[in-house]
Amino acid sequence: MNTKEPHKRLVQGKVISKFAEKSAVILVERKVVHEKYRKIVKKFKKYTIHDENNQVKVGDFVSAIECRPLSKTKSFTLKEILVVGV
């Protein structure tokens, strides 16, 4: 039997808020080319992530991986802290 591991999204961003126990909000920036004007535009999106050990602080640059929905807004868990206190 050939079991395939499901593809999970990996996002990297800066922690902008630590509002509750085991939760944090990260801001992910991506660059896209504007369809009409062909200019590179920055787009931002906020993700609520699950931090099981309460180890992130505001300003850290972290990596998060997609998981099953943990609450209404949380679908990502902390994978690793890339840079402490950016």
From Swiss-Prot:
It comes from the Bacteria. Belongs to the universal ribosomal protein uS17 family. HAMAP family: Ribosomal_uS17_B. Keywords: Ribonucleoprotein, Ribosomal protein, RNA-binding, rRNA-binding. One of the primary rRNA binding proteins, it binds specifically to the 5'-end of 16S ribosomal RNA. InterPro entries: NA-bd_OB-fold (IPR012340), Ribosomal_uS17 (IPR000266), Ribosomal_uS17_bact/chlr (IPR019984), Ribosomal_uS17_CS (IPR019979). CDD domains: Ribosomal_uS17. This is Small ribosomal subunit protein uS17. The keyword Metal-binding does not apply. One of its GO terms (biological process) is translation. GO terms for cellular component: cytosolic small ribosomal subunit. Part of the 30S ribosomal subunit. The keyword Transmembrane helix does not apply. One of its GO terms (molecular function) is rRNA binding. SUPFAM superfamilies: Nucleic acid-binding proteins.
